[in-house]
């Protein structure tokens, strides 16, 4: 409810309604944000997205900036994780009983191996156009943890030097 409220209040450009309708056909609102780090729980992805939006607004937003851009970046930067995880089971030894038990865990089931930030941009642009600064911010929101940056690519540095919104989302 909070995500949809923030989204509808701030994101009004053409296609935004179609994007939200599509989101509701995915597991975005119930999916985890990761398999073992932040938000590795049911609804972790939507909670993480709201938290990033709130942090951006609280720490960086100033009068005259685009509230819509902040909402798009904060709420949709991890859109790539919709329909990305599946629940599997693994055997874990119960410390109390000494018995092996099947326990659920999240695992990656990437149906569109397009990268991380770039996949979010790709999915968003199926429905609505992004401003260049928004696309750059979402593409590089992982910073030095992005596979391209870890592989020696310097584009993230140039993106952060040129687009302040990218630094704020990271």
What role is predicted for each listed range?
Residues 18-25, 38-50:
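All-alpha helical catalytic cores of prenyl diphosphate-utilizing isoprenoid enzymes
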Residues 35-39, 47, 54, 58-170:
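Divalent metal-dependent catalytic cores for phosphoryl transfer on phosphate-bearing substrates
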């Amino acid at each position: 409810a909070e995500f949809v409220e923030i989204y509808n209040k701030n994101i009004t450009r053409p296609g935004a309604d179609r994007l939200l309708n599509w989101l509701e056909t995915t597991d975005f609102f119930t999916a985890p944000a990761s398999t073992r780090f932040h938000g590795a729980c049911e609804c972790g992805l939507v909670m993480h997205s709201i938290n990033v939006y709130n942090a951006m607004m609280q720490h960086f937003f100033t009068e005259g900036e685009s509230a819509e851009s902040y909402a798009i970046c904060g709420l949709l930067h991890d859109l790539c994780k919709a329909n990305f995880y599946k629940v599997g089971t693994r055997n874990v030894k119960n410390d109390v009983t000494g018995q092996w038990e099947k326990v659920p865990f999240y695992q990656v089931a990437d149906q569109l191996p397009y990268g991380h930030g770039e996949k979010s941009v790709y999915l968003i642009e199926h429905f609505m156009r992004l401003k260049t600064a928004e696309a750059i911010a979402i593409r590089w929101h992982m910073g030095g943890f992005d596979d391209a940056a870890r592989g020696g690519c310097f584009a993230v540095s140039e993106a952060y030097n040129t687009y302040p919104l990218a630094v704020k989302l990271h």
